[in-house]
Amino acid sequence: HALERPTAPLLDPTAFKQAMRNTAASVNVITCAADDGDYGMTATAFTSITADPPTVLIAINQSASLHAHLLAQRRFCVNVLRADAQELASDFAGRLPPEQRFGEHAWHRLPSGNPALEASSAGFDCEVRELSQVGSHLVIIAEVQHCWHSAHAPLLYSNGRYGQFA
């Protein structure tokens, strides 16, 4: 299929969203420990920036319940979900209310205080270094303080569906 080229001077956000649906991304649960409890949300906007120092980028909608806690705590954990964790992804994407999300799954506490998912494909415990507001989202650049990985394949999201490498 040929690529559709925009004809208007400004790209329509709907066209952009439709094109982005054709990309694939790992499915992650971003967690943060706050004074009044643990908070978390499902996110696909996560990528590495550099290995020296180990640095990652996440982007979250400013309307997300996690937003204020990330700003206050300035640390978070990226839990890369395993390929068999579709239900967990849905729990943290809003199927369960925030106060019920952590009770359904096994977690351990990192030295930073952040909750880490026992059954993750990989994890990154991070400290915020830079913040930038871009449209509706907060872009966070963070240095990785601790990371781990398992032999389990990650859960992927593309074109509105969960999947994994064949």
Task: Annotate each language-model stretch with its function.
Residues H1-A166:
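Basic, polyanion-binding surface patches
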